[in-house]
Amino acid sequence: MEYSIIHLSDLHRIKPENIECIMSSFEIEKARYAEMGLPPVQLIVVSGDIVDGSKEKDAFVAKQQIEQQYETATKFLSDLCKLFIGPKQEDRARVVIVPGNHDVSQYISERSMEQIEHDDNEIEKLADALWSDKEEGADIRWSWKTLHFNRIVDRKTYNKRFDDFISFYNTFFSGIRKFPKDPERQSYLIDIPDLNIALACFNSCYQLDHLRLSGYISPRSLSALTSDLIKAKNNGRLIVGVWHHHTRGLPNQSNYLDYTILDNMVQNGIFVALHGHQHISGMINEHKDVSSDAKLNLISAGTVYGNKRDIPPAISRQYNILVVDMNSEECSIELYSREDATALNEMPAWDRGTIGRSLKTSHKITIPITPHLVLEEEEKLQNDINQINLQIEKSGNLESGIDQLIALGMEKPLVRKFVLEMLQRTDNHIRMIQLFSDPQNIAEAMAIFESSIRNKDRSTLIKLMNLDIVKTTTDASIKSMVAEAKLVII
């Protein structure tokens, strides 16, 4: 099986009057793909920054500007889908979109914060909170523009800063999929059986706003996909991660991804991921799991229509073509960088581009594929769990549903995952402690820490802090919980 994927990122500055010229350039490209011997395009991936955003202080004007930008992006992406995939609404199922930092509506995040009035004695305390990973620092921000601390005072408003993006997303994919609203679980898996690929999509802008620029993927957004990722792996899928941020930056920068989540990505079978943000085409092996020799290959796309302000020196507009060649045991992915040969003219002239700062115009990697496993017992277990979940949703009786799940066997990871999720919807911290006092993974450790802290269960907290899974972790959330636990124990 062989097919091509178009990987775009950082649309930023496309205006209505630009669309005709851009689409003409892609019509020329489509004809050249055949000359280059590339297989047909079956997927379009857009890894964030659909719009440029607005810095207008007037919320009404800012919202109008952003909505106009999303209308333009919708027109461009619709035309691109028609050109390469098909003209029907259902053809948009082959388009994959995640948000970027420019998709955060600044006028909303500004409205959710207030400047903190403080005396000199409080500065050190506020600074410690700002740079700590404790819960108390989650709402503190620093503005270099005003040289003042700020605090999120309206979390409900703050959580609406992606509403403009979500409105665009849900309209574009009407009848196909919706973007998750829960900030801690903004992830979804797009499974495409006839291409034998599954795309694990994440919002890497968790807790990002106009004052906090660092990229971060909520661990809960990954844990929410665990069962889907296991199923995709057992079905022999190539699993591809998609998010916005790159993972490396200069010492004076902070606008890149917190890399601590990458180990979890590899453990979940994600060995290749697509991103943008740095405005340059590239490929790196960012993270390795020493125990299994597995590695995560990160592929970045440049900005498809930025201007001189957006583009690094000696680089022009760029996008990627990925050629996927798959058999039952392995998959090769060849990256072709395409670059605008003009001086940023209104109509790009695409040609061979470079990958990173090298002179290479293409590069191939090989990814192992898990053989398709026909696991009747596991499929039956999943069906049983689905039935119990349906009963819970109908009856609202969580405790009864939890009992039924436990009866399926707590030694089974899938059962444990769903029991944990159901218990987190209750306030039954005692039962949480009883069932998960020996956590098997980070998600369980987080939950048992939280319940033990709320219950002031010192003996369980001491036991947790001495577990290898806690002592050896680099997970910032666990470290934060350990710090809180120490305060309870004292």
Report the location of each language-model feature.
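Alpha-helical repeat scaffolds
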Residues: 398-408, 429-441, 461-473
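N-terminal active-site segment of His-dependent metallophosphoesterases
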Residues: 1-95, 105-106, 227-230, 234
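Active-site environment of divalent metal-dependent phosphoester hydrolases
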Residues: 14-16, 51-55, 97, 101-108, ...
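Active-site-proximal segments of metal-dependent phosphoesterases and phosphodiesterases across multiple
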Residues: 206-272, 278, 283
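Active-site neighborhood of phospho(di)ester-bond hydrolases with catalytic His/Asp-centered motifs
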Residues: 7-9, 42-49, 94-101, 239-244, ...
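Conserved beta-sheet core of the metallophosphoesterase superfamily
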Residues: 194, 251-328
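Extended active-site neighborhood of metal-dependent phosphoesterases/phosphodiesterases
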Residues: 71-220
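A short C-terminal boundary segment appended to hydrolase-like catalytic domains
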Residues: 323-413
